[in-house]
Amino acid sequence: MNVTSLFSFTSPAVKRLLGWKQGDEEEKWAEKAVDALVKKLKKKKGAMEELEKALSCPGQPSNCVTIPRSLDGRLQVSHRKGLPHVIYCRVWRWPDLQSHHELKPLECCEFPFGSKQKEVCINPYHYKRVESPVLPPVLVPRHSEYNPQHSLLAQFRNLGQNEPHMPLNATFPDSFQQPNSHPFPHSPNSSYPNSPGGSSSTYPHSPTSSDPGSPFQMPADTPPPAYLPPEDPMAQDGSQPMDTNMMAPPLPAEISRGDVQAVAYEEPKHWCSIVYYELNNRVGEAFHASSTSVLVDGFTDPSNNKNRFCLGLLSNVNRNSTIENTRRHIGKGVHLYYVGGEVYAECLSDSSIFVQSRNCNYHHGFHPTTVCKIPSGCSLKIFNNQEFAQLLAQSVNHGFETVYELTKMCTIRMSFVKGWGAEYHRQDVTSTPCWIEIHLHGPLQWLDKVLTQMGSPHNPISSVS
């Protein structure tokens, strides 16, 4: 049955446009979304014809089809608010679209959503879906002068407990700056301290580091750079096209290709696991994320939805009144999504969430243990596979311990409602009533394979390893 026959009371224009609707999108909601669009486009000469041309001839060039941009950039359709280009890309191209982070405008688009013009283009064929970048393999030297001092990945869940600093605090978007160009050094001559032409844009390392060749070392009292608020909080992912050929550093002259082992990144079955804590007590079983879009909320879900981790279902006999009250305020919680090799956290709760992500802190030039406050309605990129890949590729030439340090980057901590750090009376995440720990399986497994190739005290690197 043609989808247009389902709507006997809609206008001919709406019926025509619904003919190109993708089948999985909700029928009634799609009808209302298209009807709202038709009313706007009828006020513009030729706009309807241009949209129909784009939908009927997807491979042919088409012009922008624009509607006025609202104050908050969103469009309301039947009690649901969303970004207009996401709504219509979902209706006509990708029913499984979750977020604007999954879309990039084509170069031909004159009014892309991120440009903050008075008009925004909703032509679904002026956007493309973000693809996961292919990460180059890490080249691990077969011979090493380093003497590994650690065993392989132990219980990484406790890695951050001995940090000597009380975490600093930052608030999104106020404390964040929009990177002017590439978010980190991007040329062979501008990399890290202790390398030729090292840049000052570094990842400050814990002062307890004893490795003089560490690419992350920086005095503990070095102040962070001045921060400027970003131009557009909605587009605050700072993403730039990255030349993946630049990510693996050139091999030293004395090492030939035959002296290295290539270790490739592999996408795991579950991209992350999430563990819930109340104070310093783990509560319930770990949640393993198979979907790239996961909700962690304070409700109960008897249907056992694989895309939701419902904290309301979990019981704890040691729960006190502070924890009970905090749990009541988690509400819609946080939306985590993994797209294009990047992890985003969107705060759906009416209360803020607080995130400690070393990868995010590295990207923004913060101290590694900084805790970032994400207010309600905001989203922040909390992990980038490409940046992690570059750090890993550079770390293998600094020895086992430097690579092992990166395990800390693969665990993200997130507190609901209550913050912790220098600006709060709670100094550690284990003092917050309700928090989660996110373990990123892909980067962790990649590290594990690299460390295995590098050897351990029980398996020293040799010419026959």
UniProtKB/Swiss-Prot annotation:
Residues 221-232 have a biased composition (Pro residues). The modification Phosphoserine is found at residues 463, 465. Residues 418-428 are annotated as: L3 loop. Ubiquitous. GO terms for molecular function: co-SMAD binding; DEAD/H-box RNA helicase binding; DNA-binding transcription activator activity, RNA polymerase II-specific; DNA-binding transcription factor activity; DNA-binding transcription factor activity, RNA polymerase II-specific; I-SMAD binding; identical protein binding; metal ion binding. It is found in: Cytoplasm; Nucleus. Pfam families: MH1, MH2. Residues 162-246 are annotated as: Disordered. The modification N-acetylmethionine is found at residue 1. It comes from the Eukaryota. The keyword Nucleus applies. Zn(2+) binds at residues 64, 109, 121, 126. Disruption phenotype: SMAD1 deletion results in early embryonic lethality due to failure of the allantois to fuse to the chorion. Chondrocyte-specific conditional knockout show a delay in calvarial bone mineralization and reduction of postnatal bone formation. Its main location: cytoplasm. SUPFAM superfamilies: SMAD MH1 domain, SMAD/FHA domain. Residues 179-212 have a biased composition (Low complexity). GO terms for cellular component: chromatin; cytoplasm; heteromeric SMAD protein complex; homomeric SMAD protein complex; male germ cell nucleus; nuclear inner membrane; nucleoplasm; nucleus. Residues 271-465 form the MH2 domain. Residues 12-136 form the MH1 domain. Phosphorylation of the C-terminal SVS motif by BMP type 1 receptor kinase activates SMAD1 by promoting dissociation from the receptor and trimerization with SMAD4. Phosphorylation by ERK2 MAP kinase in response to EGF or HGF prevents SMAD1 nuclear accumulation and transcriptional activity in response to BMP. Dephosphorylation, probably by PPM1A, induces its export from the nucleus to the cytoplasm. Dephosphorylation is inhibited by association with EGR1. The MH2 domain mediates phosphorylation-dependent trimerization through L3 loop binding of phosphoserines in the adjacent subunit. Found in a complex with SMAD4 and YY1. Interacts with HGS, NANOG and ZCCHC12. Upon C-terminus phosphorylation: forms trimers with another SMAD1 and the co-SMAD SMAD4. Interacts with PEBP2-alpha subunit, CREB-binding protein (CBP), p300, SMURF1, SMURF2, USP15 and HOXC8. Associates with ZNF423 or ZNF521 in response to BMP2 leading to activate transcription of BMP target genes. Interacts with SKOR1. Interacts (via MH2 domain) with LEMD3. Binding to LEMD3 results in at least a partial reduction of receptor-mediated phosphorylation. Belongs to the dwarfin/SMAD family. This is Mothers against decapentaplegic homolog 1. It comes from Mus musculus (Mouse).
